[in-house]
A protein has these predicted regions:
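Intrinsically disordered, low-complexity regulatory segments enriched in Ser/Thr/Pro
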Residues: 80-135
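Negatively charged, low-complexity tracts enriched in Asp/Glu with abundant Ser/Thr
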Residues: 24-68
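Amphipathic, interaction-prone secondary-structure segments
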Residues: 50-100
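Intrinsically disordered, low-complexity coil/linker segments enriched for acidic/polar
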Residues: 10, 46, 50, 75-77, ...
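Ampiphathic alpha-helical segments that act as solvent-exposed interaction surfaces
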Residues: 24-27, 111-165
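Short acidic DE-rich linear segments
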Residues: 172-176
Length: 176
């Protein structure tokens, strides 16, 4: 069988689960890059990665972990979120990133519109990944209810409503 003693899973099961987690992480980062950061930038005169914006993100990051920091990338249109965590600590990586994102959402201009194409693509991709992952989730009905609320709210209003706060964070924690 060659089971992993810590997870009690075969090598194939373990690899498949890691691939699913990576896909979900890519989907979240796509949302952060294409929807969330441009949305937050409306508070900073449209300059997405200026010093004031990065300082604001860092202030939010410090609220959830002193191991997290945000810095400018190699060019003015890049940003890096970095964590001083062990390489395989998926739970901490994702939960801290989403806590930081959720906390920072209070700064967003909720009347600004977001790119509808990215919103729909993100929701559909995320739902498809979650469907693949559902077999290992105990409380699946409650889990999908949260994502249904999130998807309906985003597509109906084409902006981030106040009810969006905390949805991702609470739902994501149920994956683990």
């Amino acid at each position: 069988m060659n089971n992993n003693i810590r997870t009690n899973k075969t090598k194939e099961e373990f690899v498949k689960e890691m691939e699913q987690r990576i896909n979900i992480r890519k989907t979240i980062m796509d949302f952060v890059d294409n929807v969330y950061f441009p949305m937050m930038a409306t508070k900073f005169d449209g300059k997405v990665y200026n010093a004031r914006f990065i300082n604001a993100l860092n202030a939010e990051a410090k609220k959830v972990s002193d191991r997290m920091y945000v810095k400018r990338g190699y060019s003015n249109d890049e940003i890096e979120i970095q964590l001083r965590l062990s390489q395989w600590n998926y739970n901490d990586y994702e939960s801290i990133l989403l806590k930081c994102k959720t906390n920072a959402e209070g700064r967003i201009d909720y009347n600004a519109t977001i790119n509808d194409h990215y919103t729909k693509v993100w929701i559909e991709n995320f739902k498809s990944y979650i469907e693949e992952y559902q077999k290992s989730i105990d409380n699946y009905d409650e889990y999908m209810k949260v994502f249904a609320e999130l998807g309906d709210a985003l597509m109906k209003y084409n902006k981030l409503p106040h009810s969006f706060r905390g949805h991702l964070d609470k739902a994501w924690m149920r994956i683990y």
